[in-house]
């Protein structure tokens, strides 16, 4: 099921949440709407679902304009950040709920419902919890049950609003890898909202970077990371450094794109070591460059030659190995 978003705008009083948004999502794609709080990504997701009405523009599902269709008529599955499971129902009954609420003429028999629910619980690898209640589950398990419930009614489109935002970092990482594998199996057109660039990079086929109600860039994870369309995209997609030059330009580069040396070598610039922070397999070194207020961060492997006996206040020499020149505004 393809999705076309045509010239969609939305205001909340004087606040412009979306400004003339255009986006095509292909059938079977997993697309991330990525951006900071207030950028319009959740509003756009809610408009796709039919939970919000745009002030202008159209939403088209597979050639059919659904802009005036009620949310119940759009056949979308929705997974929220906070699970929204029924506390008084077992896992089985939560997943079966949507099937049992279908109109009588469309409702499958109880044996068919049972088979469908167990199929979905097996798919999310939690069939062994069918008789448990939500309060007996971990956060990650609850979110997988919420996803199974959304899939039970066989939606044409799956929408996920920060689905892993309420979980701890380790569980989030496990679940997003699981979601990427699951999407390959079910091949269902899916759109998910996130402010976590690592999550978007790991899960999505394409990323839509949003800021202040507009789309800054659309592309594959590799495209938006390696060829950012704007200063905003570059900074939002990962840690970054800014090195001022003397010709009304500055360089942008990532902490892992820095060469370090204890001695002065060609094209390397002197800087004072302000902090040395071991981070497991890597070490982050914070540097102060004469003539600019912004600090420079470099990340190197923990046994890098430049780190041996290094202390705060000493001089290191650094050079960006890859960078983007940008004109000062």
Swiss-Prot record:
Alphabetized Pfam families for the sequence: ABC_tran (PF00005), TOBE_3 (PF12857)
Catalyzed reactions: sulfate(out) + ATP + H2O = sulfate(in) + ADP + phosphate + H(+); thiosulfate(out) + ATP + H2O = thiosulfate(in) + ADP + phosphate + H(+)
Positions of the ABC transporter domain: 3-237
UniProt subcellular location: Cell inner membrane
GO molecular function: ABC-type sulfate transporter activity; ABC-type thiosulfate transporter activity; ATP binding; ATP hydrolysis activity
Top-level taxon in the UniProt lineage: Bacteria
Subunit structure, as described in the record: The complex is composed of two ATP-binding proteins (CysA), two transmembrane proteins (CysT and CysW) and a solute-binding protein (CysP).
Physiological role: Part of the ABC transporter complex CysAWTP involved in sulfate/thiosulfate import. Responsible for energy coupling to the transport system.
Family per record: Belongs to the ABC transporter superfamily. Sulfate/tungstate importer (TC 3.A.1.6) family.
Name of the protein described by the UniProt record: Sulfate/thiosulfate import ATP-binding protein CysA
Organism whose genome encodes this protein: Pseudomonas aeruginosa (strain ATCC 15692 / DSM 22644 / CIP 104116 / JCM 14847 / LMG 12228 / 1C / PRS 101 / PAO1)
């Amino acid at each position: 099921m393809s999705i076309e978003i045509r010239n969609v705008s939305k205001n909340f009083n004087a606040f412009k949440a979306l400004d003339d948004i255009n986006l095509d999502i292909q059938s079977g794609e997993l697309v991330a709407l990525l951006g900071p709080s207030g950028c319009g990504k959740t509003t756009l997701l809610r408009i796709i679902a039919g939970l919000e009405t745009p002030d202008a523009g159209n939403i088209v599902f597979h050639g059919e304009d659904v802009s005036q269709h009620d949310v119940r008529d759009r056949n979308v599955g929705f997974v929220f950040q906070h699970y929204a499971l029924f506390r008084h129902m077992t896992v089985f009954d939560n997943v079966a709920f949507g099937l049992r609420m279908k109109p009588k003429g469309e409702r499958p028999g109880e044996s068919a419902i049972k088979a469908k629910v167990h199929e979905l619980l097996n798919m999310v690898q939690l069939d062994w919890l069918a008789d448990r209640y939500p309060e007996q589950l971990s956060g990650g398990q609850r979110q997988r049950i919420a996803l199974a419930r959304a899939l039970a009614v066989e939606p044409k489109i799956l929408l996920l609003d920060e689905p892993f935002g309420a979980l701890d970092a380790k569980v989030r990482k496990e679940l997003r890898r699981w979601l990427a594998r699951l999407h390959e199996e079910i091949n269902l057109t899916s759109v998910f909202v996130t402010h976590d660039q690592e999550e978007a990079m790991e899960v999505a086929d394409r990323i839509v970077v949003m800021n202040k109600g507009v789309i800054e860039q659309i592309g594959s994870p590799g495209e938006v990371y390696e060829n950012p369309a704007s200063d905003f995209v570059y900074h939002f997609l990962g840690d970054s450094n800014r090195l001022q030059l003397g010709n009304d330009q500055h360089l942008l580069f990532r902490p892992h794109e820095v060469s370090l040396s204890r001695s002065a070598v060609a094209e390397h610039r002197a800087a004072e070591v302000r902090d040395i922070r071991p981070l497991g397999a890597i070490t982050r070194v914070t540097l102060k460059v004469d003539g600019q207020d912004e600090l420079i961060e470099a990340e190197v492997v923990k046994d890098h030659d430049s780190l041996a006996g290094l202390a705060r206040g000493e001089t290191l020499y650094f050079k960006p190995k890859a960078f983007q020149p940008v004109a000062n505004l």
